[in-house]
Each structure stands twice: as structure tokens, then as C-alpha cells.
């Protein structure tokens, strides 16, 4: 238990020293986002993220709440007020410097950081309260003063939500593109099957026509011939079809002359 009190005293003393260094709101709000995060202007995105997590854990209002409950008479009321304001500015500074475009605009033109040191811009209270709700004592007393609340009220949650929405939009667009490509492939397949079927029907019709022509070619005049004559004529036409190219084959032949009956010889009378 003594170790716990010792650590809480260290936390309370560090918070008191931090608050004592800013004797008024004007001095606290005159700091730049780099000064809030205790980083140089040449810091990288990883430096900002690392320092932000470190300072959030160090200056979270829940720590001050626990220290005030254990030793309320030793904690001046200005500490809570100053640390809440500092924590709010910490969230705003991280939101600004984590955005590459806004950070470049701030470095060049001094915009996006609406502090009293820039009188041409609106007051910081209206700007910050719309994006970063202050940590109210009533919410803390109701058990709502957790790190999750600050996360959902901070710019980190907004960035995560925006990234999630962008990913969801990208997934939806990807599904639409995939569905479009699949539809095109199905249409191409159906059209290809239609063309193949049409070609097959035309080839089949042409083959049937050629078969009918060949049948007419071989069967013309067969009805008027005897069985032996039909066999002889078929053999002759088959031999001729082997010698004559198909494209030069006549479509029909004139009917053969009807064979005359052999003359009968008179029988001698006895």
C-alpha cells in the first residue's frame, strides 16, 4: 500500500509541476502543437505517434482523478482545470500533426491551429469543442472518464473510421468491378455458344443438301431401268464420280435411253 501511495504522490507532483509551469490559460494556449507534444519541427510521423501515446498515458485525467480522491486536500483545483485543458490541446495537436496535408499547411501558413497567438483565426474553444469534447466532471463521476471515451472523441477515432469507410468503399468498388467482369465473360460465352451453334446448323444444313443432291444425281432415271441396268449404271456413275472433281460434278444427268427389247427371230415352221 505504501508503494501505491508513493507512486500516486509522484504522479500528483509531476502533474503539479506541469500545471505550475503554465500559470494561466493564455500561456498554455500560446504553445504550438510541437511544443504541446514536446517534439521538434523535424519530427517524423512515428515520432509523433510514439510521443502522443507516451503523453496520453502520462497526462490522462483518470490519473488526476485517482490522485484527487486519495488526497483531495493536497490537490489544488487548478491542477484539474489546467490538465484537462492540456489534454484537450494534446488531442488537437496530435490530430493536426498526424495529418500530412494539414501539417504542411500549418508549417507554411500557420493555419489549422486556432490559438490566441493567431488573432486572425476564430477562438480555439469553438474549434476544439466541435471536434474534441472536453472531459466533464459529471461524466467522470458517472464512470465515463475512461481512455475509450477519449479515443472515440478524438481525431484518432475519426481517422480510423475514415480509413474503415475508405476500405469498405474500396471493397464495394472491387465487388462491382468483379461483377462487371464476370458479366462480360458470361455474355461473351453465351455469344460464342450462339455463333458456334449457328455455324453447326449451317454446316448440317449444307451437308444434308449435298446428300440430297448426290441422291438425286445417282437416282435419276433409275425407275425406268431393270435391276441389272440400275446396278450397271450405279457402278458406272460411281467410277465417274471418282474421276470428276466434286465441284465439276453435274447436278443431274439426262435420263438414259430406254433399252429396246431384242428382236425376236421367227421360229421355222415344221
Swiss-Prot record:
Source organism superkingdom: Eukaryota
GO terms, biological process: ERAD pathway
GO molecular function: Hsp70 protein binding
Gene3D superfamilies, alphabetized: DnaJ domain (1.10.287.110)
Listed Polar residues bias regions: 242-251
SUPFAM superfamilies attached to this UniProt entry: Chaperone J-domain (SSF46565)
Keyword GTP-binding tagged: no
Disordered: annotated segments: 239-270
Record key words, sorted: Chaperone
Biased composition (Pro residues): 252-270
Record domain J: where: 43-112
UniProt-listed PANTHER family: CO-CHAPERONE PROTEIN DJLA
Protein's UniProt name: Uncharacterized J domain-containing protein C4G9.19
Species in which this protein is naturally found: Schizosaccharomyces pombe (strain 972 / ATCC 24843) (Fission yeast)
Amino acid at each position: 500500500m505504501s508503494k501505491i501511495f508513493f507512486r500516486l504522490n509522484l504522479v500528483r507532483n509531476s502533474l503539479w509541476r506541469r500545471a505550475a509551469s503554465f500559470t494561466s490559460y493564455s500561456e498554455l494556449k500560446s504553445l504550438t502543437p510541437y511544443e504541446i507534444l514536446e517534439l521538434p519541427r523535424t519530427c517524423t510521423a512515428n515520432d509523433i505517434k510514439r510521443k502522443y501515446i507516451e503523453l496520453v498515458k502520462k497526462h490522462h485525467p483518470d490519473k488526476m482523478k485517482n490522485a484527487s480522491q486519495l488526497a483531495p486536500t493536497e490537490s489544488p483545483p487548478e491542477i484539474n482545470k489546467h490538465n484537462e485543458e492540456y489534454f484537450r490541446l494534446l488531442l488537437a495537436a496530435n490530430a493536426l500533426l498526424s495529418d500530412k496535408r494539414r501539417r504542411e499547411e500549418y508549417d507554411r501558413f500557420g493555419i489549422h491551429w486556432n490559438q490566441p497567438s493567431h488573432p486572425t483565426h476564430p477562438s480555439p474553444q469553438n474549434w476544439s469543442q466541435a471536434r474534441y469534447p472536453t472531459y466533464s466532471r459529471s461524466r467522470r463521476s458517472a464512470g465515463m472518464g475512461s481512455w475509450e471515451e477519449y479515443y472515440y472523441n478524438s481525431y484518432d477515432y475519426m481517422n480510423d473510421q475514415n480509413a474503415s469507410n475508405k476500405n469498405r468503399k474500396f471493397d464495394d468498388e472491387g465487388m462491382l468491378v468483379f461483377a462487371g467482369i464476370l458479366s462480360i465473360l458470361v455474355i461473351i460465352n453465351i455469344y460464342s455458344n450462339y455463333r458456334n451453334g449457328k455455324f453447326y446448323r449451317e454446316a448440317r444444313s449444307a451437308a444434308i443438301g449435298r446428300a440430297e443432291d448426290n441422291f438425286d444425281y445417282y437416282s435419276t432415271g433409275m425407275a425406268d431401268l431393270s435391276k441389272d441396268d440400275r446396278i450397271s449404271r450405279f457402278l458406272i456413275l460411281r467410277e465417274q464420280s471418282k474421276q470428276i472433281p466434286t465441284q465439276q460434278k453435274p447436278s443431274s444427268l439426262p435420263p438414259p435411253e430406254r433399252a429396246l427389247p431384242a428382236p425376236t427371230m421367227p421360229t421355222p415352221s415344221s
